[in-house]
Amino acid sequence: TAFSIDPWLITTEFHKCGRVNFGEKQGLECVAMGVEKVLHKIRAHYAKYGIAHEPYVYVKSDSGTYGMGIMTVKSGDEMLEINKKIRNKMNVIKEGVQSTEVIIQEGVPTVDVVDAAPAEPMLYLVDGHAVGGAYRVNDQRDAENNLNATGMRFVGMCDESEADATHKALPPCQFGALG
């Protein structure tokens, strides 16, 4: 029996912009329009599913971020109004590589919490099988920001059999071990 599922439930909306130079303020109009385009799509999904959360997007380099050159925005106007400090941060990523193309990606609020801090799960797969994992945790960030930043740490991931039923937060365990 076949079934159908809205692809948005398992993927995110995104848009790409090329020929961007944050230092020279070139291409920011494309980024701003892309932000609005993605936000419009997200708002439609939120209305369809009754989600009462303000949508946001990540604007990030398309050449890998290493946790650098990422910003969270809630409107295209924010892109047109960014100050020089933020433009410089977005213009150059790790090892001085200039960011000339960006991805505008739907933001998904972090729902996992470890030690009262937002956390995102990371699973390690070998041959399609989960063999380990950890949570990226950052108590200096909120549920809408990139957790791969200063203050980030990893906490081992356990399966339910290792959890103490009375413990509300995720349990400490051996880093990376599952099952």
Name each region found by the language model.
Residues T1-H53:
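Conserved N-proximal alpha/beta basic substrate-recognition cap immediately N-terminal to
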Residues S4-T11, Y58, T72, I103:
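A structural signal for short, well-ordered beta-strand segments and their strand-loop junctions
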Residues P7, G18, P55, P118-P121, ...:
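Proline-rich intrinsically disordered, low-complexity coils
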Residues H15, V20, E24, S61-Y66, ...:
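Generic detector of intrinsically disordered, low-complexity, polar/charged segments
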Residues K37-Y56, S63-M68, K74-M157:
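Phosphate-binding site of ATP-dependent enzymes
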Residues T150-G179:
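Conserved catalytic alpha/beta cores of large enzymes that bind or transform nucleotide phosphates
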